[in-house]
A protein has these predicted regions:
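Well-ordered beta-sheet/strand-loop patches within structured domains
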Residues: 2-172
Length: 172
């Protein structure tokens, strides 16, 4: 979904009209909350349309492990207009205590992280418009909820207890 998120951010900055977008179920590490877009099966998709009177062209290029999207077209927005997108966290949900799953294949007392926990979040994305550096507009684009998830560890069997050694008492 990093591909979809990258395209979404290009579409936002070009100020194209987003007609469908869903967030990931949990926060992702490569963008701030509410700056993401997910695709999955037939139930999550990213759709947008050209709301300008002139054609646009969006090019995607891959070089090594880097994907770049570039939007081309005639910029019909007023000169001096800039936009900024601000992620605002409205609340968080603690993931709770980690889950421990017994794994007899591990050494006694061993503990191996299977998955990291995620803090749940509620966030929104603001679009802020500036004309010659002066804020002229601000709107909420969307509000999103991200699930919390507990960390999961596999744990080996309990370490065997060592019997206590008692010293014989001295004769009295």
């Amino acid at each position: 979904c990093q591909l979809c998120t990258t395209l979404y951010n290009v579409v936002l900055r070009a100020e194209l009209e987003v007609t469908q977008r869903q967030n990931h179920s949990m926060t992702v590490g490569y963008v701030k909350p509410s700056e993401d877009a997910a695709i999955a099966g037939t139930y999550k998709d990213l759709k947008f349309k050209n709301n300008y009177d002139t054609p646009i062209y969006i090019e995607g290029l891959v070089s090594g492990n880097t994907l770049t999207f570039t939007a081309y077209g005639k910029d019909t927005r007023p000169e001096g207009r800039t936009v900024e997108f601000i992620s605002e966290t409205l609340g968080t949900t603690d993931p709770g205590a980690p889950v421990e799953k017994q794994d007899a294949s591990l050494a006694p007392g061993a503990r191996v992280k299977e998955s990291s926990g995620h803090v749940g979040k509620k966030s929104r994305l603001w679009k802020v418009v500036y004309e010659n550096g002066v804020e002229t507009g601000r709107e909420i684009l969307h509000t999103d909820s991200y699930m919390a998830s507990k960390a999961v560890y596999r744990v080996g069997p309990a370490a065997p207890s060592v019997p206590a050694v008692t010293e014989p008492s001295a004769p009295s």
